[in-house]
Amino acid sequence: MAKSPSLKIKGLKLNNQANITEVDCALVGAGIMSTTLGVFLKEIHPDLSIQMIETLPGEAQESSNSWNNAGTGHAANCELNYTPLEADGTVNISKALEVNVEFDLSRQLWSYLTKKGAIKTPSAFINPVPHMSFVEGDAHVSFLKKRHTALSAHHCFRGMEYTEDQAQIAQWAPLVIKGRNPSEKVAATRIITGADVSYGSLTSILLNYLKSLPGFSASFQDEVTAVDREADGRWCLTIKNRQTDHKRFVKAKFVFLGAGGGALPLLQKSGIPESEGYAGFPVSGIWLRCDSQEIASQHEAKVYGMASVGSPPMSVPHLDT
C-alpha cells in the first residue's frame, strides 16, 4: 500500500495533506505593506500563487487604519526630520529628495493602477491638501528659512512659500495662529501640492483588486504561530484560527511579514541571522480627534512642527486635516 504524503515540522509528522496549502508567496498581515507587495508581485508575475493571512477580522484594522496614522503623503514637504542641520550651519536636503522621489514612485504606481482600472476612484484614498511646516523661536525660524532656501531651489519643491508674518500664516492655517502672542517669533512654509492619503481605504481597494485575480486568496482571524524552514528551502507557516482553533499549514517559497508589531516575534521564530539585534519597545503619545465640523472646517492643511532635541521623529507635533 502506498504511503500518504507527509510533512515533518520540528518533530511533528503529518500524514494528511488536507490541511496543507502550497503557494509561491505568503503575505502575513493585511495592511498597506502586504497589499502593495501583493499587487507588485501579481503585476510582475501574474502566475504566482499568493495567500494572505490576517489575525484580525478584516484588512487595515491596525496601523493602516486611517485613524491610526496621520494620512500624510510623505514627500518631505513638511517633515523637518528629513532635512537635518549640519555642523557647518547648512541644511542637508539629500534625504528629503530621496523621500520625495519615493512618494512620486508610489503615485506612479497608483496612476498605473487607475489607468488599468484596478483603482476606480482615486479620490477615495488620495486628495490634495497643502503641506506646511511651522516653527517657533529665533533658532528654529533661522533653520526653516535655510531649509526653504535649499528646498525651493530644487524642482521637486518648486512653489514652496515661506513667511514669518503671522497674518499670512493665519490665512493658511488660522487655528495654528489663533490665541498666539502677536510678537512671538514664528515662521512657516507651505506647498499646495501636498497629498492626504487614506491608507486604510487604499488597502481595501488593493485587496479587492487582488481578490479578483486568479491565484490569490486571503484568510482572516488566522494567526501565524510558527515559522519553520524546511529542508528544500521553503517555509512552513503554522496557522491557528482564532475562532475555531483549527490548525493548518501553508508552505511557501517566499514569506513577507507585514504584521506590524507582530512581525518581530515571527521574524525571531524564523531563526534567520537577520532576526538578531532587533527589539520592540512601546511608544506612547496623545492622538486627539476633533469631530466638530465647526472647528475642523477652519483647518485645511497638514502642519508639522519641530521635535525637541533628542526626541524621535514620531514626537513631532502636527495638526492634520
Which residues are covered by each model-predicted region?
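Extreme N-terminal leader/targeting segments of oxidoreductases
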Residues: 1-25, 43-47
